[in-house]
């Protein structure tokens, strides 16, 4: 069987190719899944491409022997030392049909399941049954390929909001599959949500999904509209997928302006309600910048947010609850759309990688290793 791997070499190059490996054998509590659908998420590209220079890409070989090669800047090679020479399997999540199973989970043979555990860009994958979600009748692998990363991230944002005492959310890159899920969750759960996009057509799209507050960062009155949306919702927590540039700083500044509007007494430290931005993506590779005048007071925070530690801290009961909701709503709230379905060999095409590596909203690729 073949699986897609990414390897950093001693000569400061990264190589992506297909490795031929033995079909895995399931243990007593494991499932052997024929993978039929696995999405290309930004987190997958972090392993597949990482800090390599995509503009230096070249191709060698053909078919299953194709190798994509890119240069890795010498300045980051020190951080890559632990993975030099090690073929790293790629693909965080996916779905397929159970073709074999351990003695304790034989009842799942023939079932469609989604799973998470890495190495999903492969024809077959063994995963613990506990890492999988069994799907109902009529659900195919394409329908449930994205059952973990985006759905649980969106749900995790809402859970984080509740745990930290906030009452409304701000979300950037809101026209993404994840953003659409978050709109549906917040509408269903009665949570105010401010959506930030960067194109006029994205505003109309999200409004058609029921979004009440959509701010276009490309508009000249973006900051004013964001302040008004924050005043209306009292949003003091934001999740930023861009991870670079000045957007996080703008959000904090607009939160502060909205917060000061409700102050009855002056404070040299700004509004007293804590304002928080969590960065959970890296769509913008530039440095994060804040206004020179620190226009958001002193009650604020910026940090990273990751799904894995959130789930680890949430506990088993909450994990089961969230996964069950995803399973119940996989064709509605958590349904994902894809631009194109490609094979493992197609994923090594120069033309294809130059599209899916851009991580553009509305251009989501799905790999079908069974093709």
Identify the residue ranges that each predicted region occupies.
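C-terminal boundary of histidine-terminating zinc-finger modules
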Residues: 143-144
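C-terminal substrate-binding/catalytic core of Rossmann-like NAD(P)-dependent dehydrogenases/reductases
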Residues: 223-227, 231, 281-341
């Amino acid at each position: 069987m073949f699986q897609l791997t990414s390897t950093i070499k001693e000569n400061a190059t990264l190589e992506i190719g297909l490795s031929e490996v033995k079909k895995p054998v399931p243990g007593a509590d494991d499932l052997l899944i024929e993978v039929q659908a696995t999405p290309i998420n930004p987190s997958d590209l972090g392993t597949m491409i990482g800090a390599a220079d995509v503009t230096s890409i070249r191709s060698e070989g053909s078919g299953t022997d194709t190798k994509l090669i890119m240069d890795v800047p010498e300045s980051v090679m020190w951080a890559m030392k632990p993975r030099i020479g090690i073929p790293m399997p790629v693909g965080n999540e996916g779905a397929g049909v159970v073709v074999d199973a351990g003695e304790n989970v034989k009842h799942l043979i023939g079932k469609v399941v989604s799973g998470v555990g890495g190495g999903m860009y492969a024809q077959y994958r063994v995963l613990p049954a506990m890492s999988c979600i069994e799907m109902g009748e009529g659900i195919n692998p394409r329908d449930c390929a994205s059952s973990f990363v985006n759905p649980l991230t969106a749900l995790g944002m809402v859970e984080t909001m509740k745990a930290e005492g906030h009452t409304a959310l701000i979300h950037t890159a809101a026209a993404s599959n994840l953003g659409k899920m978050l709109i549906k969750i917040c509408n269903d759960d009665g949570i105010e949500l401010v959506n930030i996009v960067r194109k006029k057509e994205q505003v109309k799209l999200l409004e058609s999904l029921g979004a009440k507050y959509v701010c276009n960062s490309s508009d000249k009155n973006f900051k004013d509209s964001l302040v008004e949306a924050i005043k209306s919702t009292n949003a003091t927590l934001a999740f930023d997928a861009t991870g670079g540039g000045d957007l996080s700083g703008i959000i904090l500044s607009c939160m502060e302006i909205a917060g000061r509007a409700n102050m009855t007494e002056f404070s040299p430290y700004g509004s007293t309600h804590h304002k928080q931005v969590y960065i959970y993506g890296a769509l913008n590779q530039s440095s994060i910048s804040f206004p020179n005048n620190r226009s958001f007071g002193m009650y604020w925070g910026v940090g990273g947010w990751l799904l894995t530690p959130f789930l680890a801290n949430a506990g088993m009961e909450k994990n089961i609850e969230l996964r069950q909701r995803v399973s119940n709503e996989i064709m509605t709230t958590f349904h994902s759309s894809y631009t194109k379905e490609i094979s493992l060999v197609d994923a090594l095409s120069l033309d294809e990688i130059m599209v899916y590596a851009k991580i553009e909203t509305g251009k989501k690729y799905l790999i079908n290793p069974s093709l």
